[in-house]
């Protein structure tokens, strides 16, 4: 009955315009009351439409100066706001064990209890509070948690959309790559069948691995989003329900909320991928044919030991390495390591003297950070150890060689310029893949020396033309200061 009376009172103090409890109520001469903001907006609209102000309920005209604040109604509204009108607000739950009202909250157990529960063994010694005292505190916490989770939900949905876009992009990209590979290899089918198969397998493996990982990430993102949605629904239900529903198990909900972390999906940078490209198919075909042709002249090369070179030679005369550095003791017993005259004292010739014809051999330089190789004419070992650095490595002195420094700098040595004739002209060589194995082809009659990168499908590294072979020439190897050996490969390898 009391509830019905309160409902009737609420209707009397409800604004006819916004249908909410009156805020700063103003009354007209006709007796109707409105919110100050609502009446002000209605007055402006009436003046624009009709040129006069009238009551929104009974349409009786009024003068703005006759409007008066209704403090009596304002007091009624204030009292009414303190009373809960909903059936849930008037409802008092009772303890299932004792039948008493549930008016206490146990902090340790996170439960709503009655006064008899408080005195029971289960809750004895626990910290208990009136539900009304702690409800507001937890409501603020849960409201903040709700806002945070809504933000995380938005972030999760954005991550989910990003991963789907990433997945589609990768699928399109790899499909595009596969199409290009197929088109490229169509023109090189006779020679490059194995290359095509290898590249497609790599792409398919890459597609499988990446899409598998992205699919897994997508599933995790969906589960992550769903988990956040479920927690949000739980919080909304608690916030909209009764005090008991708000507080029952609230600590567990807060712990779940605090443990919510958004895991970002794994992505794969496209700019770091290695994808097969064949920009010059005709040139590639010529390279393959040239390498196939010169390998018909493969000769079995070994080195020739001498008393001048300090290079270390294997028993089968195929492997050459630099010796260990000498230890020199200076003043006060200081120890120094030295590689005196290493550039030329570690150089050594092949045993074969070449005076005509075509000759090809290969040298394994894998894992070496420095080396020099090629051909040498008119070798004079007595003079070599007296020349420092790279000054002797010039065609005019009988050297047609290329070399590697610091593991990445590949160069060819040409004759010095007019201004610096004693120093060789260093030609930087652009190699996409640093060679682990180098092929050397000497055409005595054509006066050419060519170098091939066997590691990169036999591509041409450099070619010396118009060579002056006025005397016999020999294969030349120099392991330099790098302790890793260089090996002459047999034709059967």
From Swiss-Prot:
Associated pathway: Protein modification; protein ubiquitination
Region (Required for interaction with GABARAP and for autophagy): 185-198
GO biological process, one term: regulation of lipopolysaccharide-mediated signaling pathway
InterPro entries: B30.2/SPRY, B30.2/SPRY_sf, Butyrophylin_SPRY, ConA-like_dom_sf, SPRY_dom, TRIM/RBCC, Znf-RING_euk, Znf_B-box
Superkingdom of this protein's organism: Eukaryota
Cellular component terms (Gene Ontology): cytoplasm; nucleus; omegasome; P-body
Domain B30.2/SPRY: from-to ranges: 281-493
Keyword presence, Lyase: no
Enzyme class: transferase
Keywords assigned by UniProt, alphabetized: Acetylation, Antiviral defense, Autophagy, Coiled coil, Cytoplasm, Immunity, Innate immunity, Metal-binding, Nucleus, Phosphoprotein, Transferase, Ubl conjugation, Ubl conjugation pathway, Zinc, Zinc-finger
Phosphoserine PTM positions: 86
Cited Gene3D superfamilies: 2.60.120.920, Classic Zinc Finger (3.30.160.60), Zinc/RING finger domain, C3HC4 (zinc finger) (3.30.40.10)
Coiled-coil region: 131-240
Positions of post-translational N-acetylalanine modification: 2
Zinc finger (RING-type): 15-59
Record flagged with keyword Transferase: yes
Pfam family, one: zf-B_box
Primary location class: cytoplasm
EC number annotated for this UniProt entry: 2.3.2.27
Modification(s) after translation: Degraded in a proteasome-independent fashion in the absence of viral infection but in a proteasome-dependent fashion following exposure to restriction sensitive virus.
The protein's role, per its UniProt record: Capsid-specific restriction factor that prevents infection from non-host-adapted retroviruses. Blocks viral replication early in the life cycle, after viral entry but before reverse transcription. In addition to acting as a capsid-specific restriction factor, also acts as a pattern recognition receptor that activates innate immune signaling in response to the retroviral capsid lattice.
Family: Belongs to the TRIM/RBCC family.
The protein, known as: Tripartite motif-containing protein 5
Species, as recorded: Pan troglodytes
Name of the coding gene: TRIM5
């Amino acid at each position: 009955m009391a509830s019905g009376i309160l409902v009737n009172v609420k209707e009397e103090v409800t604004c006819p315009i916004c249908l909410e409890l009156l805020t700063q109520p103003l009354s007209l001469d006709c007796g109707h009351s409105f919110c100050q903001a609502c009446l002000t907006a209605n007055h402006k609209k009436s003046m624009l439409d009709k040129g006069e102000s009238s009551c929104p309920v009974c349409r009786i005209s009024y003068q703005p100066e006759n409007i008066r604040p209704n403090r009596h109604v304002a007091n009624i509204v204030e009292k009414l706001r303190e009373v809960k009108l909903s059936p849930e607000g008037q409802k008092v739950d009772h303890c299932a064990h004792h039948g008493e009202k549930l008016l206490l909250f146990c902090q340790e157990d996170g439960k709503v209890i009655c006064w008899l529960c408080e005195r029971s063994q289960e809750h004895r010694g626990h910290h208990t509070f009136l539900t009304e005292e702690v409800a507001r505190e937890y409501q603020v916490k849960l409201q903040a948690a709700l806002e945070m989770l809504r933000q995380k939900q938005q972030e999760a949905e954005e991550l989910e959309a990003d991963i789907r876009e990433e997945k589609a992009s990768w699928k399109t990209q790899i499909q595009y790559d596969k199409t290009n590979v197929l088109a490229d290899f169509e023109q090189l089918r006779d020679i490059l069948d194995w290359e095509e198969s290898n590249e497609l397998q790599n792409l398919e493996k890459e597609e499988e691995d990446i899409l598998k990982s992205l699919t897994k990430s997508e599933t995790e993102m969906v589960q992550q989003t769903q988990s956040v949605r479920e927690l949000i629904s739980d919080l909304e239900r608690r916030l909209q329900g009764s005090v008991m529903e708000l507080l029952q198990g609230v600590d567990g909900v807060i712990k779940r909320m605090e443990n919510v972390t958004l895991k970002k999906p794994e992505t794969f940078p496209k700019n770091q991928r290695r994808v097969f490209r064949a920009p010059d198919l005709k040139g590639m075909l010529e390279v393959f044919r040239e390498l196939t042709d010169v390998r018909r002249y493969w000769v079995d090369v070994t080195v020739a030991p001498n008393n001048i070179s300090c290079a270390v030679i294997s028993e089968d005369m195929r492997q050459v390495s630099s010796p260990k550095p000498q230890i020199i003791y200076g003043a006060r017993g200081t120890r120094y390591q030295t590689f005196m005259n290493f550039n030329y004292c570690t150089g050594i010739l092949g045993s074969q003297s070449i005076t005509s014809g075509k000759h090809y051999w290969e040298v394994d330089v894998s894992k070496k950070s420095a080396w020099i190789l090629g051909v040498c004419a008119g070798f004079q070992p007595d003079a070599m150890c007296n020349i420092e650095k790279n000054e002797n490595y010039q065609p005019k002195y009988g050297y047609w060689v290329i070399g590697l420094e610091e593991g990445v700098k590949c160069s060819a040595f040409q004759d010095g310029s007019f201004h610096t004739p004693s120093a060789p002209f260093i030609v930087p060589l652009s190699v996409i893949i640093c060679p682990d194995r180098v092929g050397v082809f000497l055409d005595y009659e054509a006066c050419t020396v060519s170098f091939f990168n066997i590691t990169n499908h036999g591509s041409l590294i450099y070619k010396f033309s118009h060579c002056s072979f006025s005397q016999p020439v020999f294969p030349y190897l120099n392991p330099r200061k790098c302790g890793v050996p260089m090996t002459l490969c047999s034709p059967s390898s």
